[in-house]
Curated annotation (Swiss-Prot):
It is an enzyme of class 2 (transferase). GO terms for cellular component: cytoplasm. Signal peptide: none annotated. This is Error-prone DNA polymerase. Pfam families: DNA_pol3_alpha, DNA_pol3_finger, HHH_6, tRNA_anti-codon. It comes from Gluconobacter oxydans (strain 621H). It is found in: Cytoplasm.
C-alpha cells in the first residue's frame, strides 16, 4: 500500500509513459479493493509507510542494498528515483491521508488472529461416507500382509493400534493419506521413492510403504515423530529419484490444483563471492577486478587481516579507498537476506484456496509457484507440508534393478535385497565404497577400516557418526576407542545403559539426547522436545546453553557426578543442528547397504547404473570406470553401431561379469535428440561415416563430437581420419546436389574426398583427446606417460603407499580429483589426487594452505612433498610443500576437480 501511496514510487513515474493509464487503473482498483476489505467485519486493516530496515543496526547496509536494487532496475530499462528516503512531511503522510485511521503505530494493537482449523488439510477419503481415519485404518489393515506375509507379530499389531489411536486423536489421518497418495502414484510410474527422517519411526508409514525401515524391529521411538505433548503436525520427508522428481511435482499441481498447492520459499543470503561482486558493481570497480576479488579474496573476507594479506599478494593497492570500502561493505552484507528462492521440495497443500490464506508468487521455472514464506513460517502457522525431495542414488538403484532383470533375470528392489550379507560387509570394511551412497566420502572411507561395520546397525552408526555434530561433541574418538576395546564401556546407571547401550555409552542420536534429558535430568517430554528444537536451530537461537543449568542440576539431583553431567551437556551442545535422528540414519543406511550390495555382487550393473545417473556423488566417470576395471569388469568404448544413449551391458569375455558398453551420453556436446536419431536409423548397422550422415539426419557438429570421442573405429577410421572425413560434409546441400537428390530418398555427400593416410595419433595424445571428448579414457592414464621423468625425481606412485614405512618423507604427483574443507576441520583442507596406480589422500594444514595457496587451488596436476601417516589400514600424506605441475600435461586438461562438495 505504501508503494501506491508514495508520489515518487516506481509506478508513479510510469504513468506518463505509453500504457500509463492502465497502471493508474490497476492502482485505483487495488486501493478500492483495500478500502472494501478495510470495512469488512473481523478484519484488521493496517496501512504502513515504506519499509526500509527491520533494525536500526543495519541502517549502514540500507543505502548499499538500495544501490544494488537500483543498478538491477536500471539494467532492465527503468530508473526510479534514488532519493526515495528523503521525503517531505506532506509526502510521508500521503498514505495516511488516503486511508484515514488505518495507520497502526503501536505494534501492541495488532493481535494474532486465530487460524481456522480444517482449511489446511486436503480431503483424502476414497469412499463416500467414510472418514479419513476409517480410510487410513482400512488401508493399513489391507497392507499388513504385504509387509508381513507370515503374519504381523503381536508387538507390531500393538504398535499399529497405538499409532492409529494417536493419529485419530490428533486428526492427522488426512496428512498420512495425502502422503500415501503421492507415494502410490510415484510408484505406479515406476519411480523409486522412500520416506526418511522421523517418519521412519512410524509403523503405519512402514506398513503403507512410505518408509522402508521396520521401526519395531529397529527399536525406533514413535513419539519422536508424533506425540500429544508436542502438539505439532507430523513432517514426512519423501525422497524420489532426482531426475524424475519434477514428474511428481507437476502431478501434485495437476491433482490438487494450482490454487491449492505451492512450494515454500527459502531466504537466500549474501555469501562472500556474491557480496564482493555486488558491492564492487555499486562502487564502480572494473568487472575484471571484481572477478579477481570474488575468486581470490572471498574465502578470507570475514577475516580483515587475512583479506588484506591476500589483496597484497594480488598486487592490489590497499590505499585505494574504494577497495577498502568494498571489503568493509561486503563484510557487512554477509548473511544478510538477498532474495527469495524455492525450497527444494517443501509442498504446502490445502483444502481452501491458497491465495486466500497466503501470498503467492511465480518462479523462474515454468509451471511452479511458491509461497513467499519459508518453512519455519509454515510450521508456525501449522499448514500441512509434504517434503518432495530428490535423491540421485534412488535413480541409480532403479536403473540397476532394471539391468539386473534384463541381463541376469533377477527381480530385485529395496525390500528384497538380502539382509546382513557378510561379503558386502567385508567389502565395506576395506573402504572399497567408491560410488556407494553416504559412505563414499574421504571422511567415511577413512573411518570404515576402524569402524569395521558388520551389521546393519553398525552401518546406521557409520552414517551418523561422520557428521559435524558427533565430531564437535567429541563423540567420535570415544566411540571408536570403545569399539576397538581400547577403552572400557561404563555406564553410571542402569538407566543410561538402556539408553546408550547400542552406542557403547556415547550419545550419537537426537533421540538419545531426549531420553537422557527425560530419564536422567528430570525433563518432561515437552521440555526434552524443546531441547531437541534448540539443538536443531542453534544458529538462530544460540544453541542449548539456556538448558545447561536445568540439565546439569537435574542430573546432579539424580545422583550423577558433576564431571559426567558437564561432559554430557558438552556433548549435547556439540550436536548443534547436526545431531542426527536415528530414524534418518537408518533410512540412509538402508540405501547405503543396497548400493554396497549391488557394487559387491554386480559391479558391472552398478558401474553402468552409476554412469547413467551422472552427475551425482563425489566421483567423476573416470574414477567410476577405473574402479569397475579394478573389480574385473570389462569396459568397452563408445561405438556408433553398438552404443545406445545410456551405458549398457553386453556379454563379457571372462564369463563372470557382463561388459559395460559406454553410451552416447558420455560424448560431450552430443544432444539427447541426436543420439536418439542415430539409434533410430541404425537398422541395419552403419557402414561408413558417409552412411551415418545420409541416414541419421543429424548435424555435422554431432558427427564431429562422435569422431572426437573415437566412435567410428568400427569403420577402421581412428579419430584423425574420421575428423578428416567429416570435413567434407555439410548440414545443407549445395543447389546442384539438392536438385540431384529430389528423386532420391537420401542426400549425396557434397564432396568426395580422395583417400589419404593420416599419421597415427600418439598414445599420449589419444588419451588426452579421450578425456577432452568424454571425460575418461580406456587407453591409459595421463600420469603414466610422465612416470619415467617422475621416477627420476624420486616421486613414488600412489599405489606404493601401503608398502612404505609410516613417517617416511615422500614425494607424490597426481591429478587433483577433489578438494574438501569441512567446517569441523578448523580450516584444514583434504585433497585427493590420482595417478595410474590409484589415489592418495592429502592433509593440508592451514599454514601450508596460505603458503601454497595458488598451486593448491589452481593445479590440475599437483606435486607434493609430505610425511606418510598410517593408522591401521588408513593412509594419509601430511603435506609440507606443494608445486603446480600442470604444464607437464602440455595444455591438456584431463578432468576438472570436484571441489568442496
Amino acid at each position: 500500500m505504501a508503494m501506491y501511496c508514495e508520489p515518487r514510487s516506481e509506478w508513479w513515474t510510469r504513468l506518463p509513459a505509453p500504457g500509463g493509464h492502465r497502471a493508474w487503473i490497476a492502482c485505483s482498483s487495488a486501493l478500492s479493493r483495500s478500502a472494501v476489505l478495510a470495512g469488512t467485519p473481523a478484519r484488521l486493516p493496517v496501512s504502513t509507510s515504506a519499509f526500509l530496515t527491520h533494525s536500526f543496526s543495519v541502517c549502514a547496509e540500507q543505502p548499499i542494498l538500495l544501490a544494488i536494487d537500483t543498478i538491477a532496475v536500471q539494467r532492465d530499462g527503468c530508473s526510479p528515483s534514488c532519493s526515495r528516503t528523503r521525503r517531505t512531511a506532506r509526502e510521508r503522510t500521503s498514505g495516511e491521508n488516503f486511508f484515514t485511521g488505518l495507520l497502526i503505530r503501536p505494534s501492541s494493537q495488532v493481535n494474532r488472529s486465530p487460524l481456522i482449523p480444517g482449511r489446511f488439510n486436503p480431503t483424502e477419503t476414497e469412499r463416500t461416507g467414510e472418514s479419513a481415519q476409517e480410510t487410513l485404518t482400512r488401508l493399513v489393515q489391507a497392507a499388513l500382509p504385504r509387509r508381513y506375509p507370515a503374519g504381523a507379530p503381536p508387538e507390531v499389531e500393538t504398535q499399529i493400534a497405538h499409532e492409529l489411536r494417536l493419529i485419530g486423536s490428533l486428526s492427522y489421518a488426512p496428512y498420512f493419506l495425502t502422503v500415501n497418495t503421492i507415494v502410490r502414484h510415484a510408484r505406479s510410474l515406476g519411480i523409486v521413492c522412500q520416506g526418511r527422517g522421523s517418519a521412519a519411526n512410524s509403523a503405519v508409514c512402514y506398513v503403507l510403504g512410505i518408509t522402508s525401515i521396520d521401526p519395531v524391529r529397529s527399536g525406533l521411538l514413535f513419539e519422536r515423530f508424533i506425540s500429544t505433548e508436542r502438539q505439532e503436525p507430523p513432517d514426512i520427508d519423501v525422497d524420489f529419484e532426482s531426475d524424475r522428481r519434477e514428474e511428481v511435482i507437476q502431478w501434485i499441481y495437476r491433482h490438487y490444483g494450482r490454487h491449492r498447492a505451492a512450494l515454500c520459499a527459502t531466504v537466500q543470503r549474501y555469501q562472500p563471492k556474491g557480496a564482493l561482486r555486488e558491492v564492487g558493481k555499486v562502487l564502480g570497480l572494473p568487472e575484471d577486478l571484481t572477478g579477481q576479488l570474488s575468486k581470490h579474496i572471498a574465502s578470507s573476507l570475514a577475516d580483515p587481516d587475512l583479506c588484506k594479506a591476500r589483496a597484497a599478494d594480488l598486487g592490489l593497492n590497499l590505499k585505494d579507498r574504494r577497495l577498502s570500502l568494498t571489503f568493509h561493505l561486503a563484510r557487512l552484507l554477509l548473511g544478510f537476506p538477498r532474495q527469495l528462492g524455492t525450497h527444494p521440495g517443501g509442498f504446502v497443500l490445502t483444502e481452501d484456496r491458497l491465495d486466500e490464506l497466503v501470498p503467492l508468487m511465480p518462479t523462474a521455472m515454468d509451471g511452479r509457484q511458491i509461497i513467499v514464506w519459508d518453512k519455519d513460517d509454515i510450521d508456525v502457522l501449522r499448514f500441512m507440508k509434504v517434503d518432495v525431495l530428490g535423491l540421485g542414488m534412488l535413480g541409480c538403484l532403479r536403473r540397476g534393478f532394471e539391468l539386473l532383470h534384463t541381463v541376469y533375470q533377477t527381480r530385485m528392489d529395496l525390500a528384497a535385497i538380502p539382509a546382513e550379507d557378510p561379503q558386502t560387509y567385508r567389502m565395506v570394511q576395506k573402504a572399497d565404497t567408491l560410488g556407494t551412497f553416504q559412505i563414499e566420502s574421504r571422511a567415511q572411507m577413512s573411518m570404515l577400516p576402524r569402524m569395521k561395520p558388520a551389521t546393519f546397525y553398525d552401518l546406521v552408526i557409520q552414517v551418523a557418526i561422520v557428521r559435524p555434530g558427533p565430531i564437535q561433541g567429541d563423540m567420535v574418538h570415544p566411540y571408536l576407542r570403545r569399539r576397538e576395546k581400547l577403552e572400557p564401556v561404563t555406564y553410571p546407571s542402569e538407566t543410561l545403559r538402556g539408553i546408550l547401550g547400542k552406542t557403547l555409552g556415547v550419545p550419537l542420536f537426537q533421540e538419545q539426547a531426549m531420553q537422557v534429558a527425560i530419564h536422567c535430568a528430570g525433563f518432561t517430554p515437552g521440555e526434552a522436545d524443546q531441547l531437541r528444537r534448540a539443538m536443531a536451530t542453534f544458529k538462530m537461537t544460540g544453541g542449548v546453553s539456556p538448558f545447561r543449568d536445568k540439565l546439569v542440576n537435574g542430573m546432579l539431583a539424580n545422583g550423577y557426578e558433576q564431571e559426567f553431567a558437564e561432559q554430557t551437556f558438552a556433548q549435547l551442545e556439540g550436536f548443534g543442528s547436526y545431531g542426527f535422528p536415528e530414524s534418518h540414519a537408518a533410512s540412509f543406511a538402508l540405501i547405503a547397504y543396497a548400493s554396497a550390495w549391488m557394487k559387491c555382487h554386480y559391479p558391472d550393473v552398478f558401474c553402468a547404473a552409476l554412469l547413467n545417473s551422472q552427475p551425482m556423488g563425489f566421483y567423476a566417470p573416470s574414477q567410476i570406470v577405473q574402479d569397475a576395471q579394478r573389480h574385473g569388469v570389462e569396459v568397452r568404448p563408445i561405438c556408433i553401431n553398438a552404443s545406445r544413449w545410456d551405458c549398457t551391458l553386453e556379454r563379457g569375455r571372462n564369463g563372470r561379469h557382463a561388459a559395460v558398453r559406454l553410451g552416447f551420453r558420455m560424448v560431450k556436446g552430443l544432444a539427447n535428440g541426436h543420439g536418439a536419431a542415430l539409434i533410430a536409423a541404425r537398422m541395419p548397422d552403419y557402414e561408413s561415416i558417409d552412411d551415418v550422415w545420409r541416414r541419421a539426419d543429424v548435424p555435422v557438429a554431432a558427427l564431429k563430437c562422435l569422431a572426437e570421442a573415437d566412435a567410428f573405429r568400427v569403420f577402421g577410421q581412428m579419430r584423425r581420419a574420421a575428423l578428416w572425413s567429416i570435413k567434407g560434409l555439410a548440414d545443407t546441400a549445395l543447389p546442384l546436389f539438392e536438385a540431384a537428390d529430389r528423386g532420391r530418398n537420401f542426400p549425396l555427400p557434397e564432396v568426395i574426398e580422395p583417400e589419404i593416410t593420416l599419421p597415427m595419433m600418439s598414445e599420449r595424445a589419444s588419451v588426452h583427446e579421450d578425456y577432452r571428448a568424454t571425460g575418461l579414457s580406456l587407453n591409459g592414464h595421463p600420469v603414466a606417460f610422465l612416470r619415467e621423468g617422475l621416477r627420476k625425481e624420486g616421486i613414488v606412485r600412489c599405489g606404493d603407499l601401503p608398502y612404505l614405512r609410516d613417517g617416511r618423507r615422500i614425494q607424490l604427483t597426481g591429478l587433483v580429483l577433489m578438494r574438501q574443507r569441512p567446517g569441523t576441520a578448523n580450516g584444514t583442507m583434504f585433497v585427493t589426487i590420482e595417478d595410474e596406480t590409484g589415489t592418495a589422500n592429502l592433509i593440508v594444514w592451514k599454514d601450508v594452505q596460505e603458503k601454497y595457496r595458488r598451486p593448491l587451488l589452481a593445479s590440475r596436476l599437483l606435486a607434493c612433498k609430505g610425511r606418510l601417516q598410517k593408522e591401521g589400514d588408513v593412509i594419509h600424506v601430511v603435506v609440507l610443500s606443494l608445486e603446480d605441475r600442470t604444464p607437464l600435461l602440455q595444455g591438456s586438461e584431463p578432468l576438472k576437480a570436484r571441489d568442496f562438495r
